[in-house]
Amino acid sequence: MTPLELLGLICFFAIVRVAISIKPAPVIAGASGGPTARTVIREYLDAFIVAGLVALFLITFVVRTFFIPSGSMIPTLQIHDVLLVNEFEFRFAKPQHEDIVVFPPPIPSPNDFIKRLIGAPGDTLRIHNGIVYRNGVALDEPYEAEKPNYELEVRDYEIYVDGQPLDPSQANIPPKAMWSAPDRIPDGCYFMMGDNRNDSEDSHIWGFAQAGGTFDAGPLKGERASFTGKAFLIFWPLDRLRVLH
């Protein structure tokens, strides 16, 4: 976390702390009314101290910040949004469909990726005429910027895009022994997509993301493969403050 991001997080919690602590001043006959300058300063100082402690605890043990550098998740996430990511989430629960997940990239890249989880282990997956079908059911996806302009299908132990299998030297496609069935996503593997479907470098290009252990194939075979966490809040800029779904 950069100093600027930490300052933003502290300011966010300070604003919340001040907001919940404001109380109407009692009206006393003959009194001038209103808090003194010293009281106001003490209140704000208290808020920033508490906010700082809360922020330090969270970034040490629970959450991290994530800066959005690209438009692959538009409209849900905008370029320069700063998110809070729950690093505990997947220590106690499995990733769920439609979660917005931060994870190490399965291709060489200096930065973690953030995408939406569309397919989980055991799912069948197909994209036809711009519609995503999971386990044979068309998905309702109000979050997508536009319909995907490619055809895709998980079958024959491969991911086929526009009728061609992904190159196993460039994409993470586990060996057949890891698949429970030729048309179902393998154990430990997830199909990730950006909400900005036609401007997103995601699983239709680099194959599956993996949630544990090491990558089983592709250019990062043997490297760490575990989800970093679940994004749950846009906290900066303040005019975009919202919980993520």
Where do the language-model regions lie?
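Short, basic/aromatic beta-hairpin or loop at an interaction surface
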Residues: 51-62, 72-81, 165
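Soluble "head" domains of membrane/secretory-pathway proteins
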Residues: 2-31, 35-41, 66-67, 75-245
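Transmembrane alpha-helices and immediately adjacent membrane-cytoplasm interface residues
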Residues: 38-67
